[in-house]
Amino acid sequence: MTPVFLLEELQKFISSKTSDIILPVRTRTGSNEEKERAAAVYKMGLPEADDVQQKVPYILLKFLTGTDDKKAGEPEEDSCKVRIIFAVYSEDGQDGPLALLNLILRVRSELKKAGTIGGGQFALELPLEYI
């Protein structure tokens, strides 16, 4: 398994499964930025250092660890752990956490339902851990 390809497939999968969840955007005073949009999905990092707040809402995919478990005479079996970081914005103390939970649960549900991504190239290993 190539972690780069996995992150690319995860990005496509998560973008398509969350595109209908429209969330508030933190806008600068006097700007003509859109006030709502779906969460953007990024791999490994945000485009700019100060984007932690400016790009909200977003989902960030980070490769954590990888394991090669190939035994003699068996097909190659690699695995890796990916952390999925969710960020949302809300001026309301209840709406923000609920929007965050909704986004997390949508991704979790769609991953479990699919079982694999990338045309079956990447299989999900249970259990999923989320906090």
Predicted regions and their residues:
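Generic secondary-structure microfeatures
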Residues: 62-67, 84-90, 111
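Ordered, soluble secondary-structure elements with a strong preference for glycine-centered loop motifs
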Residues: 4, 94-101
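A generic structural signal for short coil/turn motifs at secondary-structure boundaries
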Residues: 70-71, 91-97
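Oligomerization/assembly interface segments of phage tail-like spikes and tubes
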Residues: 76-92, 105-107
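Small/polar-rich, solvent-exposed N-terminal microdomains that initiate assembly or binding
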Residues: 1-74
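Acidic-leaning, charged glycine-interspersed low-complexity segments
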Residues: 20, 98-131
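Generic internal hydrophobic packing segments that stabilize the cores of diverse globular domains
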Residues: 58, 81, 100-104
